[in-house]
Amino acid sequence: MSRKTWIILGVMAALIAGGAYYVLGRDGGMQTVAAAPAKGYEPLPTDHTMGNPQAKVVLIEYASPTCPVCANFMLNFFPKLKRDYIDTGKIFYVYRTFLRGPDDAVAEKLARCLPKDKYMSFTDSLFRNQSKWDYEFGVPSPEGVHAALVKLAGEAGMNAADADRCIASTAEEAAISKVGEDGVAKYAINATPTFVINGQAQAGFEDFFGRLDRALSGK
């Protein structure tokens, strides 16, 4: 087994030991702004947010980089969400990564090692290029996943040596674990994507905009 394989497996083991949660089974561009208090919202230090922090509706999205349904939402539904709800100040949007497996952990570590203002654009790139790095799409091995993720990180400005060090580092593991722990404890998150609208969680995005509109109208 290669060194890179051991690095990836080591990341997974450390996260499990730290309390990270994983869902069994596998089912445009964004801007990061500073997190701010909003009604019914308890921020985590790692949150990435957009929109009006004083909005009457707070939307928290829990998504996994390896989740095809999450990618579908981010690529095909998020542009409308941003244009009609976030940019207009109707809602306060919070993005959180929820780990389903080791590939998510490696991807999230790389996202966190980039400058904060590149986190969401890299996350967007992960979804857009999911077929190039996620084993569900035929990437044959941990080494293949590693190489593909390092390449994507390189496109975001991180050199390969820094990417390898980032993946091997344990510095972000507690923060990564905390997101999963918090989601399970507060909202019983057990699948991705899950959307929490003013404290009410629902997996998937059936009637998504209808739910937002009802929350905005107070129904």
Name every feature range the model reports, one short phrase each:
Residues L59, C67, A163:
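Residue-level signature of catalytic and energy-coupling elements of molecular machines
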